[in-house]
Amino acid sequence: MKFLVLLFNILCLFPILGADELVMSPIPTTDVQPKVTFDINSEVSSGPLYLNPVEMAGVKYLQLQRQPGVQVHKVVEGDIVIWENEEMPLYTCAIVTQNEVPYMAYVELLEDPDLIFFLKEGDQWAPIPEDQYLARLQQLRQQIHTESFFSLNLSFQHENYKYEMVSSFQHSIKMVVFTPKNGHICKMVYDKNIRIFKALYNEYVTSVIGFFRGLKLLLLNIFVIDDRGMIGNKYFQLLDDKYAPISVQGYVATIPKLKDFAEPYHPIILDISDIDYVNFYLGDATYHDPGFKIVPKTPQCITKVVDGNEVIYESSNPSVECVYKVTYYDKKNESMLRLDLNHSPPSYTSYYAKREGVWVTSTYIDLEEKIEELQDHRSTELDVMFMSDKDLNVVPLTNGNLEYFMVTPKPHRDIIIVFDGSEVLWYYEGLENHLVCTWIYVTEGAPRLVHLRVKDRIPQNTDIYMVKFGEYWVRISKTQYTQEIKKLIKKSKKKLPSIEEEDSDKHGGPPKGPEPPTGPGHSSSESKEHEDSKESKEPKEHGSPKETKEGEVTKKPGPAKEHKPSKIPVYTKRPEFPKKSKSPKRPESPKSPKRPVSPQRPVSPKSPKRPESLDIPKSPKRPESPKSPKRPVSPQRPVSPRRPESPKSPKSPKSPKSPKVPFDPKFKEKLYDSYLDKAAKTKETVTLPPVLPTDESFTHTPIGEPTAEQPDDIEPIEESVFIKETGILTEEVKTEDIHSETGEPEEPKRPDSPTKHSPKPTGTHPSMPKKRRRSDGLALSTTDLESEAGRILRDPTGKIVTMKRSKSFDDLTTVREKEHMGAEIRKIVVDDDGTEADDEDTHPSKEKHLSTVRRRRPRPKKSSKSSKPRKPDSAFVPSIIFIFLVSLIVGIL
């Protein structure tokens, strides 16, 4: 019986599990809301349904306002249906107007966040995609001229041409509404120097509501609109001196608390003739508001304003009414005061003027005239071409040889415009920015580059860079500005004439006349220096470097005048001039090992002892040298008038093989002699093996005979390299390893092997290891490579020598390419059934299969045509349950 009950429970489980798929509809209630149809042509401005005109980011909307509980299922325009849905009511709707005529619309359903967009074409409304709606909305915004993008500073609650401001008081709380005007777009909201909100690239601030107590911002509501026309709200509250975002519920609950809460303050008296700086904040005057601002520190509040013994203002109820800011205009002449109060609606502002030494009540019109008068006095202009220091501080500066000017306004002055002739570079736009500094770069007597620094009310600077192209100024980026600065600095540098250029054009001998040149301290006129520059000045500059290169004078070369008395009158050192051209060729002998044993080497004209001889002009081989300077040893050179203009004078200093490092001739003698000794000893100690017969492509050359492949004039080694390798050069003759390209050992070679200077032989010697070509290595199979133990090598007697295998460059290249080939072979394509696919790459043809080796063990191939699709695991669940039930019933029976 127990088994039957268990079976019954199992059978009843399946309908219960399937019940999850059923949708249980709620029981309809008897109180059904009526379906409402709304006509957008209705002129109703209040009630359960009406349209509220809204202007956001330059586009005008008609926003549908409905009371809770009203369900709108149809929106029409007269007899034309815009939207209709019998099942789901709308949540919100807005009509976009163009020239006061409906143009587009969007509808948002109650339970669907996706918007539905409509476009009016003629007399019909048709749905359109979101992209098309946004594109047309962007066209409407582009038709409106955008005058400025600005940041809203809530601490400056004054009228501005960029936004409208409406304020109202309730108890001690002041509510201010800021709305940007048409053409001006607000992107950021901040208070003093604290940033509160910054809109995204596709968002704009349409309105801001702030709640203040005095000048302290406590609560904030920011209205934001995006590209789709959707409005959102951002709420912020002052918590621990920081503006933290809060929810809409917190915002609504905080407003009554602010109105009912009366923050206690301490009454204080303000004496404008003697201000107590401890209890008040002081604000500077600006062009927009040219008044000196006085603000009491928290928690104090001004209840009485006096000027010495004269009382200007006194609160009637000090516990409730007070002044939270005083602005003082023009202390010297016809002063005026503006008091910002927290009471006495609707103005909340009082004005006072000083007439004939007595303070009297004034009006806002008088204050406006006073502000205009002060603005005219503060305003000044900046002409980048003619800078006046009357109202500006002009400081000339230099960067290298580049001249530029830093211009700042003097105290109580403001630059309102920067221009160049009739072209305006910058002008004052309003409260948000003012010019603090200007850098003007001048080239060739005219301004070329201008850098303007505009300071905003927040701690941030806006830099404007402009460059003059032709007759107009163009605004550039900071990177381009940096590049222009570098160009101007490079252009302004005074480039000194090159020494080589002077030497090539003006290379002469000693000065004319028997008188020695004057010393460094002797003053002479500029005309005399120009006359003697060709004969005396230029050789002096090159005399010092020549002495330094010869190793005889170690002092650094200085000005030309300092070398006049020390170089030019000394005629005994003039024969040293040609030594410089021959010194680079002395290392020719170490380059070739053949020449050290020549008996003519000690008397060769390239001998290191040559600098001591003064009979150089008598040498017969001297005129043959193409780089030999003949002019320095000519005794007629000092009196030759054409010698400085000779074009052949720069040959010796411009020799490309001239040593760049000073070199001592005595040191070269010692090193050269030591090299000869080492080479002679090497020749005597080395025992050469018998020369075996070679093939036709290799010809042996005796040591003493020159070869056709080895030229007589071998390129010399530079002295700098020769000096660097002084400790290694003598050992390289003994330890120089001459091997084949395979890196295998070879028989001893003579030091002057002609293989250095002759082309490589095409054949191989029996005693040399056979080097296979790279193509032969690639043709070997994998089995041949693995079974090869080494290569065949024969010694000088012809006996085969078995050596261990070492990987040469060819072997590494061959193995790498074999591995790459094997990787291509192992590429197997598998189909859905797990078998190899029948493609040509996986199963190559007969010819292709013979040339490659499959590294993978073969397995039986299954035909892809006969394969059946596998059943999913869920298909076996009914079979398993059926088997389980059958077995259970059988067990019970």
Curated annotation (Swiss-Prot):
Residues cleaved off as propeptide: 874-893
Membrane protein topology class: Lipid-anchor; GPI-anchor
Signal sequence segment: 1-19
Keyword tags: Cell membrane, Glycoprotein, GPI-anchor, Lipoprotein, Membrane, Repeat, Signal, Sporozoite
Compositional bias of kind Low complexity: 595-606
Chief location category: membrane
Keyword Glycoprotein on entry: yes
Cellular-component GO terms for this entry: plasma membrane; side of membrane
Comp. bias regions, Acidic residues: 831-841
Superkingdom of the organism of origin: Eukaryota
Compositional bias ranges of the Basic residues kind: 851-869
InterPro entries for this protein: DUF529 (IPR007480)
This protein's name: 104 kDa microneme/rhoptry antigen
Record organism: Theileria annulata
